[in-house]
């Protein structure tokens, strides 16, 4: 991961609030982790869907930015998430990758796993700036 990408990802106050950690961001792929904590729970004691979406969106953004020099060069236009199973505790790993990198738009996909279990799957379109 480039130093610039690492600085961008780790300087987000929202990412720090959630506890996101960038493990990799290079070549159109990113891997982020999130450890479940009480601040991320919904009324049912499970991981809030908004926190899971934020993990996915951030991973996709890092994958997109990694195609260049790591600086923010795109924004999310739309994103569809399939929430597959609830999360009560533990660590999540999100892997995001660029499926199509055009001049004006990019299509990305992501999967979130807890161990071997698939937690969520997503697809999005980004606009290139």
Where are these regions (language model features)?
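Terminal targeting signals and extreme-terminal segments of soluble enzymes
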Residues: 1-129
